[in-house]
Curated annotation (Swiss-Prot):
GO terms for cellular component: cytosol. InterPro entries: AAA+_ATPase, DNA_recomb/repair_RecA, DNA_recomb/repair_RecA_CS, P-loop_NTPase, RecA-like_C, RecA-like_N, RecA_ATP-bd, RecA_C_sf. This is Protein RecA. HAMAP family: RecA (MF_00268). Belongs to the RecA family. It comes from the Bacteria. It is found in: Cytoplasm. SUPFAM superfamilies: P-loop containing nucleoside triphosphate hydrolases, RecA protein, C-terminal domain. It comes from Chlamydia abortus (strain DSM 27085 / S26/3) (Chlamydophila abortus). Keywords: ATP-binding, Cytoplasm, DNA damage, DNA recombination, DNA repair, DNA-binding, Nucleotide-binding, SOS response. GO terms for molecular function: ATP binding; ATP hydrolysis activity; ATP-dependent DNA damage sensor activity; damaged DNA binding; single-stranded DNA binding. ATP binds at residues 67-74. The keyword Repeat does not apply.
């Protein structure tokens, strides 16, 4: 078949597909309304936004946040909810653990009056609610906290001690098959918080695994591994918060396996000022001499905590430092952006 005949055959096939399945059911990626832009929601930690490579968590995708207990999973998810609301978006929180603290969420910056919350009885109800919210097209982010607490209905109705092999994994697999396409169409970000377990009898390699089977690993565009690596000491004998290290374990939108560190303070959540200060020092925007921090010809203060408090008060300086960090780190092109440029360079037939 020569080239003109191949084109005619393709055009006929496209016309039939559009007639059968509707306009826009198939299109050239570089033409029409096929968008290359990825809308994101900031995480609240600039270092993590940079590690993700796209400036935050993507809309229309599934994101998994997993880690040990008290590592900051819920705090990170709540910051994403707060940032989505600040952008004028709508957020929903499916609290399967029945453990959301409204006062802490409010302290972080979430608008609890406008936050939609659901505390379903079983896993099937939770996932159905998530799908219906996504299908509405009016919700920007849905947090499911957590996968481990999504109890299948048959397990809930049975007795303690009954064996239910692979029941939760099958439930997750079935739900995610339906949810993925709905999220993409509605541009809703679904954040699944997950716990870790240990495999029995593993002598070599990492014995840790996440609950809910393999489906969530496959369907997630981004997987964030979050860990507590130390305590932040106060002036007295008490701790101010935790030092957190995050690894991007999977990333379909930018290079994976990047890491980021930031502080989670007990009275305010993720310390944006501390995060910006660390990045400014790392990129030689702020000079650190001994315990003193200098910016251009100005002394910011002595000691990291004192400078962090000063930056919290001086919003103008904080924004200036953030702007300079973003200029210095002018992020490398994402996979999508590289593909867009490649398509633009191709000759038009």
């Amino acid at each position: 078949m020569n080239v003109p005949d191949r084109k005619k055959a393709l055009e006929a096939a496209i016309a039939y597909i559009e007639k059968q399945f509707g306009s826009g059911s198939i299109m050239s990626l570089g033409k029409h309304s096929a968008s290359h832009e990825i809308s994101t929601i900031k995480t609240g930690a600039l270092s993590l936004d940079l590690a993700l490579g796209i400036g935050g968590v993507p809309k229309g995708r599934i994101v998994e946040i997993f880690g040990p207990e008290s590592s900051g999973k819920t705090t990170l998810a709540t910051h994403i909810v707060a940032n989505a609301q600040k952008m004028g978006g709508v957020a929903a929180y499916i609290d399967a653990e029945h453990a959301l603290d409204p006062s802490y969420a409010s302290l972080i910056g979430a608008n609890i009056h406008d936050l939609m919350i659901s505390q379903p009885d079983c896993g099937e109800d939770a996932l159905s609610i998530a799908e219906l919210l996504a299908r509405s097209g009016a919700v920007d982010v849905i947090v499911i906290d957590s996968v481990a607490a999504l109890v299948p209905k048959s397990e809930l109705e049975g007795d303690i001690g009954d064996v239910h092999v692979g029941l939760q994994a099958r439930m997750m697999s079935q739900a995610l098959r339906k949810l993925t396409a709905t999220l993409a169409r509605s541009q809703t970000c679904a954040i699944f918080i997950n716990q870790i377990r240990e495999k029995i009898g593993v002598s070599f390699g990492n014995p840790e695994t996440t609950t809910g089977g393999r489906a969530l690993k496959f369907y997630s565009s981004i997987r964030i591994d979050i860990r507590r690596i130390g305590a932040i000491k106060g002036n007295e004998s008490f701790d101010l918060g935790n030092r957190i290290k995050v690894k991007v374990a999977k990333n379909k939108l930018a290079p994976p396996f990047k890491t980021a560190e930031f502080d989670i303070l007990f009275n305010e959540g993720i310390s944006s000022a501390g995060c910006i200060l660390d990045l400014a020092v790392e990129h030689n925007i702020v000079e650190k001499k001994g315990s003193w921090f200098n910016y251009q010809d100005r002394k910011l203060g002595q000691g990291r905590e004192a400078v962090r408090e000063e930056l919290k008060k001086n919003k103008k300086l904080l924004e200036e430092l953030e702007k300079r960090i973003l200029e210095v780190t002018a992020s490398p092109k994402t996979i999508v952006e590289e593909k867009k440029e490649e398509l633009a360079m191709q000759p038009v037939a």
